[in-house]
Amino acid sequence: MNILLIGGSGKFCEKLIKYGDGHSFLTPPKKLLDVREFSSIEYFFQHYDTEFDYVIHAGAITRPMVVHEENPTLSIQTNVIGTANVVMLCKEYNKKLIYISTDYVYSGTDGNYKETDAVKPFTNYGRSKLAGECCVQMYDNNLILRIAMTTKPFPHTKALKDMKKSYMYTDDAAKITLKLLDETGIINVGGESQSVYEFVKKENPDIGFNYLSEISDVKMATDCSMNTTRLKEILDDTII
């Protein structure tokens, strides 16, 4: 498959390329394809139309989370307007759009969220990603992946004991994404429900721990874990 990666300089896209044997990737730098500028994306689609059939949109402002609270305009320009621009060009040029979303679109209190459960983001980051999802859903040829992932090795010296997620490492998330390219709708992508500390400790027994009350400068979820039944059914009950 011929795939345009938006956000291609990020760690997740690096893993897609690493595990993407048999696929051909276009990874334009931001100066060539800036999602905030419609004309920039339009120019790229016009000149490289025949070189890709799929678009994986992983370009977004993510961390630090406080940025989205202090400067929501930045989130809107990139995560919302930028995504809308991508959607419009995918529609015009008939490209399959795979949108990389997040577990932060859920309310983050009850856990075990299904794709069909109500969404109620608790941060501006989550709101910006949900707004992106809404734009994507206005185009039929789409796939939305709500992924809970982190880099390996874990980038911090301590991990949260009182936050539950369905974390998986970016390597695994990339492998799974490449298996799902021809699916449609919304799919939760993640591992088992557990605290961040429990997840990290399996790879790093010496990891320290902390609590939300000690580290958070913005509101954070206590349980964003996801129900991944649909994912397991698609992959024949095998996560990796």
Which residue ranges define each predicted feature?
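N-terminal Rossmann NAD(P)H-binding glycine-rich loop of SDR-like oxidoreductase domains
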Residues: 1-22
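Adenosine-cofactor binding site in Rossmann-like domains, unifying the SAM/SAH pocket
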Residues: 21-44
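Glycine-rich NAD(P)-binding loop of the Rossmann-fold in SDR/ketoreductase-type enzymes
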Residues: 36, 70, 74-85, 119, ...
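NAD(P)H-binding glycine-rich loop region in Rossmannoid oxidoreductase-like domains
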Residues: 38-78, 89
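Conserved Rossmann-fold NAD(P)-dependent oxidoreductase catalytic core, especially the SDR/UDP-sugar
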Residues: 85-120
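Active-site Tyr-X1-5-Lys
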Residues: 120-148
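Substrate-positioning beta->alpha
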Residues: 152-182
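Mid/C-terminal beta-alpha module of Rossmann-like enzyme folds, strongest
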Residues: 176, 180-223
